[in-house]
Amino acid sequence: MKISVAPSLFDRIPGLCIGIVAVRAADNAAANMEAEAFRRRCCTEANLLLKMDPALAEKELEDYREILSAAGVKEGRTAVEKVFAEYRKLLGVSAAEGVPEDPEILLQPKKATLDELAGSDALPPFNPIMDIIRGGMLKFHVEIHAYDMGNRKTPLEIREAGRTFSVNLGDKVCTADWLCRDEEAGAVTEDTENILILITGMKGNRRKVAAARNELARRMKSAFDRAVEVGWLEGKETEFTAEI
């Protein structure tokens, strides 16, 4: 499995980094207790943190909006923004709720009741791979995408497309506008076995991207009992080929 990124994307966005996890021969159709437990745990942690800080992850989401703008995308939301918006809506939490006008004033942490935490599991399950991906976005506040690599022969490419960038699997478009507007090509379904996971970030959250990559690699290996491989793209490193 291979991914290549147009060097101009790294020129356009200084400090851009992409953590990679490759997984081979995963069974994404069967019930997976580890994936389900991880999704639930991430939901509970996010709910607890949102009770204490309703503006949780807003700084990171704004940074990703700036990345989209730098990449030429004028409209659209990133995957991590969509996940947080969906989760907040399901919990009935507003990002502006309880935020002090003076940033120097620290709010007294709110206490979450057992009943409130019992409703944490609001983010609906999809399939084991996507449950781990979506849980990872709630946990680390980073942009994570997974692509079905089919028979592993067709490379995944992030190409320059006019003023913006697109994600392509061979001659098919996965994402018309990089990081948003998902298409059908490369979509992860119950039949998916071989995947490339991309965790995208920048200089300011580089450590979170690395932490998310390492944890997702560990979770995928444990949940599916299959071989995984990790990679990293940054600066002049614009290609990665998995050996598994």
Language-model segment annotations:
Residues 1-244:
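Charge-biased, low-complexity intrinsically disordered regions
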